Amino acid sequence: MSDPFKGGQPDEGPGHMNIHEYQAKKLFKEAGVAVLNGLHCRDVEGAVAAYRKLGSGVVAVKSQIHAGGRGKGTLVDPVTREKIMDGGVKIALNEDDVRNFATNILGNVIVTNQTGDDGKLVNNLYVEAGCDIAHEYYLAVLVDRA
């Protein structure tokens, strides 16, 4: 993988980082940060294989695009713009759920508050092992560029 800290697209300045969740979690893991087990996949059979390999029973099937709000987004057909389903992050309880969610996510467009009405085509999934959540915390960081 190329260095994500050196920028990617020509219009991105030095230090810009634009990577998917699965790539970020790989970097965290390599740096010794504890992350849930997960696998990147690009097709439905890959998602089912990831579910089997993770062996956790419950998994999150996550669309991978460069925008936030995936969980609250709406998936639409890229041609007709007909609604496919709500949410680009789904909790799967079994293999059939994984297959269904992967089929509905991959190859379709997800529209979120950050993508605007055009949305973004989903070509990548991250299948992540589930866990029991006793407490949930959120962290936000604001960079003051002034």
Regions found by a protein language model. Name each.
Residues 2-5, 15-145:
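Active-site nucleotide/adenylate-binding loops and adjacent lid/helix of ATP-dependent enzymes
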Residues 10:
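Cationic, low-complexity basic patches in intrinsically disordered or flexible, solvent-exposed regions
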